[in-house]
Amino acid sequence: MRHRNRVKKLGKPADQRRALLRALTTELIRHGRITTTLVRAKVVRSEVDKIITLAKDGSLAARRRALGYIYDKQLVHALFEQVSSRYGNRQGGYTRILHTVPRRGDNAEMAIIELV
């Protein structure tokens, strides 16, 4: 039973799960769109929304928190520069998930997650 379990474990230990989410978040912000499994896309969506909300705040503390999460320092600086013009009047919902065909090897549900 998984009653009251809020964290999607993604079949990985906590440190590997955290590293996977950081990597997927970094690549989504860098490329604007990535293809991954549906469950991973749903988990990454909340992480990306948190990072973009931090960038909208724009304070030094928010920048340092983002630098601690995203792997690329230049990407953080670019995000903080562009976010106010791109998402200034939007209150959340910065990503879109599109369902695609299942993966050939194991028939896993695949999805494209992209920045709006």
Swiss-Prot record:
Any one GO CC term of the record: cytosolic large ribosomal subunit
Xref: Gene3D superfamilies: Ribosomal protein L17 (3.90.1030.10)
The protein's name: Large ribosomal subunit protein bL17
Keyword presence, Chloroplast: no
Binding partners and assembly: Part of the 50S ribosomal subunit. Contacts protein L32.
One biological process term in Gene Ontology: translation
GO function terms (MF aspect): structural constituent of ribosome
